Amino acid sequence: MSNINVIDILKESDALLEGHFLLSSGRHSNRYCQCAKLLQCPQKAEKVISVIAEKLKEVDFNIIVGPAMGGVIVSYELARQTNKPGIFAERKEEVMCIRRGFEIKKGDKVIISEDVVTTGKSSLEVAKVIEEMGGEVVGIACIVDRRAEDIKTNYPIYSACKLEIETYEKDNCELCKKNIPFVKPGSREQK
């Protein structure tokens, strides 16, 4: 499985885009990764997620939790490939929680699944819920790790690929200076 070129599959799926983007963080970028475009193609998603499943072979875990929306399909496919249960967390009144009869039992060893990890905010919210329920987070699995060097987590990251995507403050954005209009493709509501 190591001969899979994840970047090529992301590009073929139109999941890795070039242009001028306003990110959910408020920063601007010339590249954007929209893994939903990959996840709409089950055969391609299966290949990419197999790269993560391979990395998890030596990790001791018994359940996968994906935050809605981006982590739901990743959780399902990763659970299928690792033969572990896969569930999801979702927001209720803006607070991340485990619902729908899903549960984390005391002592469960949990992998959090994501499509893209940028700041780790969603993963950390899910980790807090898991730990409050008595579970232990043993790692974060994602298709794309696009964290900047200064973004650290307390958990190991198991990704299909690492992308370094430059971001800029609006005032320092060369694309804005060239009057190139931006697209706001993000999934998190900006306030």
Swiss-Prot record:
- Metabolic or biological pathway: Pyrimidine metabolism; UMP biosynthesis via de novo pathway; UMP from orotate: step 1/2
Q: Write out the entry's keywords from A to Z.
A: Glycosyltransferase, Magnesium, Pyrimidine biosynthesis, Transferase
EC assignment: 2.4.2.10
Example GO molecular function: magnesium ion binding
Output the superkingdom of the source species.
Answer: Bacteria
- The signal peptide, as residue positions, is none
Q: Name one GO biological process term.
A: pyrimidine nucleobase biosynthetic process
Q: Name one Pfam family in it.
A: Pribosyltran
Cofactors per UniProt?
Mg(2+)
InterPro entries this protein is in? OPRT, Orotate_PRibTrfase_bac, PRibTrfase_dom, PRTase-like
Q: What does this protein do?
A: Catalyzes the transfer of a ribosyl phosphate group from 5-phosphoribose 1-diphosphate to orotate, leading to the formation of orotidine monophosphate (OMP).
User: Self-association or partners: how does it assemble?
Assistant: Homodimer.
Q: What protein name is recorded for this chain?
A: Orotate phosphoribosyltransferase
